[in-house]
Amino acid sequence: MANSPKKPSDGTGVSASDTPKYQHTVPETKPAFNLSPGKASELSHSLPSPSQIKSTAHVSSTHNDAAGNTDDSVLPKNVSPTTNLRVESNGDTNNMFSSPAGLALPKKDDKKKNKGTSKADSKDGKASNSSGQNAQQQSDPNKMQDVLFSAGIDVREEEALLNSSINASKSQVQTNNVKIPNHLPFLHPEQVSNYMRKVGKEQNFNLTPTKNPEILDMMSSACENYMRDILTNAIVISRHRRKAVKINSGRRSEVSAALRAIALIQKKEEERRVKKRIALGLEKEDYENKIDSEETLHRASNVTAGLRAGSKKQYGWLTSSVNKPTSLGAKSSGKVASDITARGESGLKFREAREEPGIVMRDLLFALENRRNGVQTIISKGYAKIRD
């Protein structure tokens, strides 16, 4: 192409188009910095080393004077310049901003990390604030009490119930810790000691049973055995006193039922025979027995009325005898045999006397009769009470 621009040369004087395409030689390159003495001094003035950095107050005294000349004593030495612009310094921020060598360029990763940490800090702050607010809201006793009261729960009653249950459990634990003897004494030791002291004074004998509690225990056990023996004998006597009565279950044998039916038939036949004999005049009716029976009934009724009235006075009209019939037309009849009524069901029925269940006074008295020492007055008083 005619108007194609020429490629610049690489400093060797030969154009790039004239160089062979597949040449393997490495071309020479120019240095990045011109290290001539004049350029080095200029660079040293423009870029001082970090070791030569001083405070701003000291640097202001070394500035150029009014004529523009510098002090040779303050000029830095001829040192090769450094290309490291990132200077790590732990000094104050004032020193870093006062000199250009103290500045360091941040990396891209550092920016991202700083942004991430700032966001995380903000999120943590918000979360902590929200959690603190939630905790305050949850721990607010007034709001919680209002919610529980609306649900029908009384906090004070629940607390009282909890305290009572705790106190009950504590008291139960305390009672469980108390050791109870296996066998309690039959009599109280204090009462036994008082009675023994009283008896000792009557017998002119000074006794102090409280000093030796084993004496009280022995007396209590002796009284227990004595009472046990008396009660055992009374129970045995009461069992012997009561007879075992057979319970009538309502079932009878066929033989007894047949015998009863035969006896009833014989009784009816005998009564019919007696009536026929009276009607034929072979026997006379016994009026005297009837009158006697009526008189006894009147007397019994009079006695009952007198007892009810509370006076023993009897009136004549109450004791008047019944007039005997004197009709001439009455038929004479013989005496009815008294064994007829005896054979009937009008006779007395024998039954066993009702006994008191359990132990009664006479059982105890009979048990004490075998005890000859110190029971005479008790037995006499007991029998007197039974008679009354």
UniProtKB/Swiss-Prot annotation:
One GO BP annotation here?
Answer: transcription initiation at RNA polymerase II promoter
Q: Where is the composition biased (Basic and acidic residues)?
A: 106-126
User: Which CDD domains does its entry note?
Assistant: HFD_TAF4
Sorted alphabetically, which keywords does the UniProt record give?
Coiled coil, Nucleus, Phosphoprotein, Transcription, Transcription regulation
According to the UniProt record, list the residues that bear Phosphoserine.
S36, S49, S80
Q: Which GO terms describe its cellular component?
A: transcription factor TFIID complex
Main subcellular localization, coarse class?
nucleus
**Record-given protein name:** Transcription initiation factor TFIID subunit 4
